Amino acid sequence: TVWLGSGTTTSCHHPPAHKIPVEELKRSYKALHNTEYKKLVRKQMLDGERPTECEYCWKIEDLGKDKVSDRVYKSVIYSDSALKEAKTKYDWTQDVDLKTLEIAFDANCNYACSYCNASFSTTWMNDIRKNGAYQNLVSDGARAFQQDGKWAQPYGVKNKDNPYTEAFWEWWTKELQYSLEELRVTGGEATMSQDFWKLMDWWQENPSCEVRLAVNSNLGPKPELMQRLCDATHSFKYFDLYTSNEATGLQAEYIRDGLVWDTWLSNCRKMMNEGNLREF
């Protein structure tokens, strides 16, 4: 995942993200993923060492051969030949060409879900800035409910003059549109990002693109954006849409502040009936 709004990246959802140095980005837009730090971790793995970031999977695998870690689940989507190529084609110092990439353009979001925080939602951010930090709330050491997440959007809600977003567009137009199998866009809420709609407009002008687009959405944007998303799917050869809920009705609305259950359900049906979806 690359969080373009904050200029951070990680290759898995278990390790913490690290900053992408702008100096590395100036040398190559591929540094959005191929940071010098990741290359050192890559070398550790090739040398048979265990990077500390991967301890979650090591612990699972050390429990016995019948225990399957996320490392296996994340790799099974690729063929054995593709995995072998990834190991043998590149020296650890080289920039790896990606097959899948997940990005978040920014943290703009119209929800404040209870399991989220201000680093990933501007609604959370605005709540803490207006009402102050949550008090007497048991949380982890990151103090997620005490901070306003300002580090996550240093370039503002419109990503003005963001070198990370600029690097993505350069990489996308020159290489990624030809080499990727899947591009996934998450958030925040994807439909609230102007860069997301820039990507949608690009696809409408380039409908022959073979890349599969996957979008994570809360399916709760304004009706005009919902219709725009539905219409845009017809410009794609392969469009996957992901949404989720942990409960139904009032319980779902309690967990996801901003959600209107009936609207979400209606939008799910709308996308399935009117959208051009490969997978939902």
Regions found by a protein language model. Give the residues of each.
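Detector for the c-type heme attachment site
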Residues: W58-D62, C116-T122
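Recognition helices and adjacent regulatory flanks at domain boundaries
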Residues: G64-K99, C109-Y111, G132
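Leucine-rich repeat
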Residues: E170-L176, M200-N206, C230-T233
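Cys/His-enriched microdomains
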Residues: T52-E55, A107-S114
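A Trp-anchored, charged/polar loop motif used as the substrate-binding/catalytic surface
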Residues: S81-W92, D161-K174, P223
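Generic structural signal for well-ordered alpha-helices
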Residues: W169, M200, M226-C230, L265-M272
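Core AdoMet radical
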Residues: L98-N108, S119-Y164, Y178-Q194, N206-L225, ...
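Accessory C-terminal segments flanking Radical SAM cores
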Residues: T1-Y78, D97
